[in-house]
């Protein structure tokens, strides 16, 4: 209602009550005006009624909701089910036009505006998460894997154009050099006369045409989507094997091991003050030297479409060192794409991505909508430090796109606001600290090892390492989302478990461990309504082939046989402290302390 309508309403209801209603309407209008002007998420979340009012107003701007609309085409926003119309707030036209997500629809001004607003809301929240160098964000109504495939096709297309421009520049330089040499020659060689058509044909055939790059350098992560998106894009993955991670330097503290030999100790050391409850040395990471070696192995940067690395991952893998890889890609002239599936919730990951964008080359960063913003599966956010790159990938999308994931993110961003998202991020670190404290006791009681980043043993502060403040140049990739517990003797009789202690870590350790019992624990957890934790068992004799690549011990991120199965648990955004307590209670019931 406008001011004129409200003034007339005073003839029906007391003016002081109408004035209170006017102020409520103005408050919502001010927030919407602020979003449009400042292009950022509001600090405080809006009520559901206010958000629904905004959605209704936007939907009324679409032609299918005009009072006297007459449609004479094949796609006029017609929806036969009233329930479906309500589910979509009458926003039925989708987004994009003629194969470009950013194109405005003449029939859907409200939907087009909502999409543009959602993009700036996501950009603002991603900047707030720790990546202020991000210049643009585009929401794509596909899950992470297919969005990565779209990005890879865009990178391949753009990179080929760059190589062609370089080849043309080389040819131009050769022509200039040849003309200069001919002009200064004392006895120029008389060339036979050529027709215009022959000369044009000669110029085209002499242009060096670069080979089409088709390789994607991919640090190994045992997650099928990461490989299948490369295959779906018609490219060839080149896996880079991981190495054992270098332990973090940390202050002296009891009950913490930084040596792989912690798995080789006998029973006498178990339960003593030096009992290992954490071990960084069992983590795995990618070295930038191995990335460079993989590039050289396929023929150099001209044969490589991009490097595709991963930030968010399951233990014992660590996030890739995005800063080092970005610096290498900038030096080598190779595009760099980051799979940041659920990394927005990690302050560490986001600050390193920001540093990578500032110090090196990062073409695209792709993150999931559901894993980071707690919405239904179906949407992803593509980010870049270059607005033109985001425009290019949006223009590559074929056809129109679904509105559902965009509406979900729009509602969630307005409902939470900046402070609401910050609270969710802070609560995750509190839950993580609570989970680690309980898992530490759990592992010690069962004579197992908790695999967790050493610097996080007793602190939830993501900006400290080993009890000291992190310096700006200390860019060390670490996993602050996922942890793991060893299952060295799970399912073994007490006597056998005790006698096998001296052999733990050797090649025989995996053979004496009851892997079938370990796998059964994962099934029991699922039947107990506990989802998320997974049991990973070594499989040295059962190779797994995905997209033409064969792996051993798939799920453990390494070909060499790990010493034992692992119980992997992630503390993701939205997890509550009550869930942590319930998880640990059911885990204790299914995995009791050995007698």
Swiss-Prot record:
Record carries keyword Protein biosynthesis: yes
Description of the deletion phenotype: Impaired selenocysteine incorporation into proteins, such as SelT, SelK and SelTryp. No defect in promastigote growth rate and in their capacity to infect host macrophages.
Composition bias type Polar residues, residue spans: 174-187
Molecular-function annotations in GO: O-phosphoseryl-tRNA(Sec) selenium transferase activity; selenotransferase activity; tRNA binding
Pfam families, A to Z: SepSecS (PF05889)
Site (May act as a substrate filter by repelling compounds with a negatively charged alpha-carboxylate): 74
The EC number(s) this enzyme carries: 2.9.1.2
Sites where the protein binds substrate: 97-98, 105, 400
GO BP: any one term: selenocysteine incorporation
Biological pathway: Aminoacyl-tRNA biosynthesis; selenocysteinyl-tRNA(Sec) biosynthesis; selenocysteinyl-tRNA(Sec) from L-seryl-tRNA(Sec) (archaeal/eukaryal route): step 2/2
Principal subcellular localisation of the protein: cytoplasm
Primary enzyme class: transferase
Biased composition (Basic and acidic residues): 196-205
Localisation per UniProt entry: Cytoplasm
Residues recorded with modification N6-(pyridoxal phosphate)lysine: 371
InterPro entries documented for this protein: PyrdxlP-dep_Trfase, PyrdxlP-dep_Trfase_major, Sec-tRNA_Se_transferase, SepSecS/SepCysS
Location of the region described as Disordered in the Swiss-Prot/TrEMBL record: 174-208, 257-278
Binding site for tRNA: 358
Residues noted as binding pyridoxal 5'-phosphate in the record, renumbered to the chain: 75
Family: Belongs to the SepSecS family.
Subunit structure: Homotetramer composed of two homodimers.
Cited function: Converts O-phosphoseryl-tRNA(Sec) to selenocysteinyl-tRNA(Sec) required for selenoprotein biosynthesis.
Alphabetical list of PANTHER family matching this protein: O-PHOSPHOSERYL-TRNA(SEC) SELENIUM TRANSFERASE, SOLUBLE LIVER ANTIGEN/LIVER PANCREAS ANTIGEN
Name of the protein described by the UniProt record: O-phosphoseryl-tRNA(Sec) selenium transferase
Organism annotation: Leishmania donovani
Name of the encoding gene: SepSecS
């Amino acid at each position: 209602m406008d001011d004129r309508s409200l003034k007339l309403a005073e003839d029906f209801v007391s003016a002081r009550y109408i004035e209170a209603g006017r102020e409520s309407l103005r408050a919502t209008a001010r927030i919407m005006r602020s979003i449009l002007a400042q292009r950022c998420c509001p600090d405080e979340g809006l009520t559901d009624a206010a958000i629904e009012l905004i959605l209704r107003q936007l939907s009324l701007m679409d032609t299918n909701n005009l009072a006297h609309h007459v449609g004479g085409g094949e796609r006029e926003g017609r929806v036969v089910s009233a329930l479906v119309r309500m589910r979509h707030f009458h926003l039925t036209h989708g987004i994009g036009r003629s194969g470009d997500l950013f194109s405005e629809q003449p029939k859907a001004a409200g939907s087009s505006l909502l999409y543009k607003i959602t993009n700036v809301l996501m950009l603002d929240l991603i900047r707030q998460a720790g990546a202020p160098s991000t210049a643009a964000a585009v929401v794509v109504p596909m899950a992470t894997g297919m969005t990565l495939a779209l990005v890879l096709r865009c990178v391949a297309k753009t990179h080929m154009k760059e190589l062609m421009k370089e080849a043309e520049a080389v040819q131009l330089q050769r022509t200039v050099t040849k003309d200069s040499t001919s002009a200064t020659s004392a006895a120029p060689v008389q060339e036979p006369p050529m027709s215009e058509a022959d000369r044009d044909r000669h110029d085209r055939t002499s242009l060096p045409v670069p080979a089409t790059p088709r390789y994607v350098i991919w640090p190994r992560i045992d997650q099928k989507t990461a490989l299948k998106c490369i295959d779906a894009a018609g490219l060839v993955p080149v896996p880079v094997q991981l190495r054992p991670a270098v332990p973090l330097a940390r202050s002296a503290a009891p009950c913490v091991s930084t040596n792989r030999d912690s798995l080789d100790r006998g029973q006498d050391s178990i339960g003593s003050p030096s009992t290992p409850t954490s071990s960084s040395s069992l983590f795995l990471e990618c070295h930038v030297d191995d990335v460079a070696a993989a590039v050289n192995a396929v023929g150099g940067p001209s044969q490589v479409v991009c490097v595709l690395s991963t930030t968010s991952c399951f233990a014992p893998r660590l996030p890739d060192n995005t800063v080092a890889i970005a610096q290498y890609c900038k030096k080598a002239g190779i595009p760099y794409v980051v799979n940041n599936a659920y990394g927005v919730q990690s302050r560490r990951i986001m600050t390193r991505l920001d540093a990578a964008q500032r110090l090196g080359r990062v073409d695209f960063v792709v993150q999931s909508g559901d894993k980071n913003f707690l919405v239904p599966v179906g949407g992803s956010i593509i980010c870049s430090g270059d607005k033109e790159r985001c425009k290019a990938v949006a223009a590559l999308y074929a056809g129109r796109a679904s509105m559902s994931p965009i509406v979900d993110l729009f509602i969630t961003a307005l409902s939470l606001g900046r402070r609401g998202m910050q609270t969710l991020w802070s609560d995750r670190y509190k839950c993580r600290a609570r989970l680690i404290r309980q898992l530490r006791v759990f592992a010690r009681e069962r004579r197992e090892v908790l695999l967790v980043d050493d610097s996080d043993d007793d602190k939830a502060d993501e900006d400290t390492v080993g009890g000291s403040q992190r310096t700006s140049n200390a860019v060390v990739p670490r996993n602050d989302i996922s942890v793991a517990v060893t299952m060295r003797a799970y399912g073994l009789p007490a006597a056998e478990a005790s006698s096998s202690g001296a052999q733990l870590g050797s090649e025989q350790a995996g053979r004496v461990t009851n892997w079938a019992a370990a796998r059964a624990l994962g099934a029991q957890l699922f039947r107990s309504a506990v989802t998320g934790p997974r049991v990973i068992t070594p499989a040295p004799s059962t190779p797994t082939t995905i997209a033409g690549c064969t792996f051993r011990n798939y799920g453990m991120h390494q070909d060499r046989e790990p010493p034992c199965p692992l119980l992997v648990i992630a503390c993701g955004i939205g997890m509550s402290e009550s869930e942590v307590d319930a998880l640990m209670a059911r885990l204790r019931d299914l995995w009791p302390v050995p007698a």
